[in-house]
Amino acid sequence: MNAQSQESPWASREHALHLLEEMLRIRCFEDRCAQLYGASKIRGFLHLYNGEEAVAVGVMQSLRPEDAIVATYREHGHAIARGIKMSRLTAELFGKVSGCCRGRGGSMHIFDAAARFYGGNAIVGGCLPLAIGLALAEKLQKPIWRSEERRVGKECRS
């Protein structure tokens, strides 16, 4: 650490603890999913997000609530960091109608329009056309990139 970084930290202690808590929530969820999958309680494919928790939590800090998200097939962490309830995710993994996709999406196709989380895709790279189409549709419907200040790093500024 240099003198400047000690004088003006990127995040307050409270904010850093909040980020750590979010990362731990994701890890605990994934660890429990791994246990349930190993016990054959979760069927189908299960692509875990272990070791990538900081990515999801960090990315969500730079997004606004109105920003849309299209994820890859390892999307549990992004969904949790976005605010989708773990109970709905768990129900989805169990194939229950109370899941965010009514039990039909499973692990690789989490979707929640209210959270502007437009799901993942089982094909590696398959999310790119979906994201581009979504961005184009939003651009044609309303101007989303205005001169207003983006939320990037807002909580971290000193």
How would you label these PLM feature ranges?
Residues M1-V55:
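Conserved acidic/glycine
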Residues G153-S158:
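Positively charged, low-complexity/disordered segments
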